């Protein structure tokens, strides 16, 4: 496919979302227009799209075009699409669950759980497969057509030996075969087919009743059939049933169902303050964004007039992970397949996600998906989460105010390096210089956390603001290891 817990712990992630507040009408209309323009420009028969907000679920959605060219049947909200490689995150999270339960280790050798690789795949680890670092050759054209491969034939393929294009563990190279192997590992350690294990752990708890791996589960009147544009007309792609390669790209779902999955991913943020309890399942979801391998650069896909942005990307667990110039930290994945093309994007630190599902071969709706979240961000609707204030930072507010008003850094607990790096006299001079610009700052500061041991203290003063960046040391009691001052002049 082309890449464009325990029940109690899992239940902590499944609180019913609050009533969804719709997007502002003008913004919603702009997103819808962008989706339809992209579909027309790329000759896509039909598509569905959605915008998801953490805690609220699907806040906007739309459909366009036809689900079946021959029957001229339109796409509807309950139309089901294959999502191809967007399946991989379901597989990875299920594997992480099993690891958390002690049924395997991510650094296990693959041969421990799949004996058929003995002799040629002894060096492979589970982690290699998760991050596409197994040394297998990129296999999109071949791998897509392997979806219905039966278990016995897959075993025969593995026993015969698979050639490597490079040594395992060196670099990222996308491999559908690797995720098919993860499906086999899930089967072997759980004792049931990966489809059943994923459905038990993912689909059913989230209420994704319209989601499955098997076309036989889909009423024909609800299926978006797959098409390719060839010789100036639409050609029907053959349907492929379930099989061993479904773990890399076999999920069939609807827009509303997939929105539940996106909301589930977003619900794992923000993380609890260190030392505070949270459901282990939240940390397991966040582990999907823990990438490995050397970062690769990609230009942010867009069809809008936004500024170019180079995004450094690594591969996590079924998700690509990077830092965008506008959205901040992002996770995303495409899904290309004979007859289908899809894309998803989340910005976990602001709590928003978007997705597009289509029924054209290898359609890559990345650009309108990114454009939608960028438009929401630029409209001021998606600020980053405010990090909770730790006791260490909160307790520093009063000492910091004394430091500013007296010039004596001794009013705060100091780490051993603090006065070595800049002595008390120079630090007093720094404070005098900045207060000369700002004037009196009579009230205690506000505090903004960057982490449990890092933050900014800010004072509203007679002439603008004073902002102090404070970094605490990793000591049992709070001690300043760094302190930097800056003055922000008043706005004209």
Residue ranges and their predicted role:
Residues 6-15:
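Bacterial N-terminal signal peptides
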Residues 18-22:
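Boundary at the C-terminal end of the N-terminal hydrophobic targeting segment
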Residues 24-81, 100-108, 151-152, 156, ...:
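Short, conserved catalytic-motif segment at the N-terminal edge
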Residues 295-304, 328, 356-426, 490-492:
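Short, gly/Ser/Thr-rich active-site loops of penicillin-recognizing serine hydrolases
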Residues 333, 343-359, 467-471, 480-486:
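Short, well-ordered beta-strand elements
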Residues 448-492:
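Exposed beta-sheet edge and beta->alpha loop/turn motif
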């Amino acid at each position: 496919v082309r890449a464009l817990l325990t029940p109690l712990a899992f239940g902590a992630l499944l609180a019913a979302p609050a009533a969804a507040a719709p997007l502002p009408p003008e913004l919603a209309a702009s997103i819808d227009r962008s989706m339809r323009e992209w579909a027309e420009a790329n000759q896509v028969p039909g598509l569905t799209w959605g915008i998801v907000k953490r805690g609220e679920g699907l806040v906007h959605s739309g459909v366009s075009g036809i689900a079946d060219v021959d029957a001229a049947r339109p796409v509807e909200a309950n139309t089901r699409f294959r999502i191809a490689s967007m399946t991989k995150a379901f597989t990875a999270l299920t594997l992480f669950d099993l690891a958390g339960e002690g049924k395997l280790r991510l650094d296990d050798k693959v041969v421990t759980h799949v004996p058929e690789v003995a002799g040629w795949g002894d060096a492979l680890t589970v982690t290699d497969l998760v991050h596409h670092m197994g040394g297998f050759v990129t296999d999109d054209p071949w791998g897509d057509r392997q979806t219905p491969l039966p278990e016995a034939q897959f075993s025969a393929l593995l026993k015969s030996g698979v050639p490597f294009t490079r040594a395992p563990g060196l670099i990222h190279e996308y491999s559908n075969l690797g995720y098919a192997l993860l499906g086999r590992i899930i089967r072997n350690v759980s004792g049931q087919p990966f489809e059943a294990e994923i459905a038990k752990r993912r689909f059913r708890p989230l209420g994704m009743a319209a989601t499955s791996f098997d076309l036989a589960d889909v009423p024909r009147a609800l299926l978006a059939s797959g098409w390719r544009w060839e010789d100036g007309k639409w050609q029907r792609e053959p349907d492929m049933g379930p099989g061993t390669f479904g773990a890399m790209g076999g999920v069939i779902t609807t827009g509303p169902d997939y929105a539940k999955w996106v909301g589930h991913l977003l619900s794992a943020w923000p993380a609890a303050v260190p030392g505070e309890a949270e459901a282990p399942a939240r940390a397991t979801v966040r582990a999907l964004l823990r990438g490995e391998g050397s970062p690769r650069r990609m230009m942010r896909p867009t069809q809008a007039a936004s500024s170019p942005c180079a995004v450094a990307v690594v591969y996590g667990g079924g998700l690509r992970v990077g830092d965008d110039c506008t959205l901040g930290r992002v996770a995303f994945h495409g899904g290309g397949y004979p007859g289908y093309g899809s894309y998803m994007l989340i910005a976990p630190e602001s709590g928003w996600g978007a997705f597009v599902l289509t029924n054209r071969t290898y359609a890559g709706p990345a650009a309108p998906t990114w454009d939608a979240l960028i438009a929401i961000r630029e409209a001021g609707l998606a600020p980053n989460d405010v990090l909770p204030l730790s006791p260490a930072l909160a307790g520093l507010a009063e000492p910091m105010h004394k430091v500013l008003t007296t010039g004596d850094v001794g009013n705060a607990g100091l780490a051993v390096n603090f006065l070595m790096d800049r002595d008390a006299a120079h630090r007093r001079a720094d404070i005098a210089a900045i207060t000369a610009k700002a004037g009196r700052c009579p009230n205690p500061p506000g505090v903004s956390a960057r982490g449990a041991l890092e933050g900014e203290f800010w004072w509203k003063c007679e002439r603008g603001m004073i902002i102090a960046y404070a970094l605490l040391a990793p000591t049992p009691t709070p001690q300043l290891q760094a302190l930097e001052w800056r003055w922000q002049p008043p706005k004209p």
